[in-house]
Amino acid sequence: MQLIIVSGRSGSGKTIALRVLEDLGFYCVDNLPISLLPTLVHAVIEQYQKIAISIDVRNLPEHSEELLDSLSFLPKGVEPEILFIDSDDNTLLKRFGETRRLHPLSQKELPLLEALQAEHKMLEPIMERATWRLDSSDLSLHQLSEQVTERVLGRADKKLIIVFQSFGFKYGLPKDADFVFDARILPNPHWQPELKLLTGLDTDVQIFFRQEPLVTKFIYQLENFLDTWLPHFQRSNRSYLTIATGCTGGQHRSVYISQQLAERFEQKAVKVQVRHRELKTHG
């Protein structure tokens, strides 16, 4: 049986994710109290091979030990995958302003920002046990649906998906990154007038980097690092591994490095995805 637990802060996209899972053939239950999880799974294990449930802040036990107890009472051989979806505070504030929905903690008469921050604190026990995370801050509904679909389908054939993501440090760290590498020490084509307005996807910029020994060494050592540890991640209960490489603005160095790593690991029959965060939003 495949069991996916979907959690995250209100407004982050849990409902969208659960709807996607339902379309993918999962038996879905929304807002199930975590204490009822073992009972539900035992009741339907003969009838359904794929189950997804969503858990929000109202369904969590008061003590984190109760969460562990609920997971330990699942049928033998059922290893839950926990998808935790979140967005930054500003994005969530904007979404609540647009929909005019009440936050689940609004009954405590907290201002919205304080309610969101309190919710984050309360969800920490399940967030810490997440096997995959999604930061939906910059994702449209379609993009969120697409990422959930890609990762679930990738998990169906038991293959770990490696996501190579480029980003700009000036715009903040990616929240869903498992490893972050800093490419700001590398030569920067931004200072070449003819390359400034191009990106790491352009041929002229790629030629510039191929002529830089430090860039070649950087890629070589990252590849060796991932070659060493990838087998260990493949044996764990994970759907994906996000490798984020950042430079100042996320246009040149990080884009080139991420592309190069993706191409190299694709040649090794590893399932990869590439995302260039700033090319979508600041390019």
UniProtKB/Swiss-Prot annotation:
Q: Which UniProt keywords apply?
A: ATP-binding, GTP-binding, Nucleotide-binding
The keyword Nucleotide-binding is assigned to this record: yes
The record lists ATP as bound by G8, R9, S10, G11, S12, G13, K14, T15
Q: What GO MF terms are annotated?
A: ATP binding; GTP binding
Instruction: Give the top-rank taxon of the lineage listed in the UniProt record for this protein.
Output: Bacteria
Which residues of the sequence carry a binding annotation for GTP? Answer: D56, V57, R58, N59
Q: State if RNA-binding is listed as a keyword.
A: no
- InterPro entries reported in the protein's UniProt record: P-loop_NTPase, RapZ-like, RapZ-like_N, RapZ_C
Family under the similarity heading: Belongs to the RapZ-like family.
**Biological role:** Displays ATPase and GTPase activities.
* Matches recorded under NCBIfam families: PRK05416.1
Record-given protein name: Nucleotide-binding protein IL0393
Q: What species is given as this protein's source? A: Idiomarina loihiensis (strain ATCC BAA-735 / DSM 15497 / L2-TR)
Q: What is the lineage of its organism?
A: Bacteria, Pseudomonadati, Pseudomonadota, Gammaproteobacteria, Alteromonadales
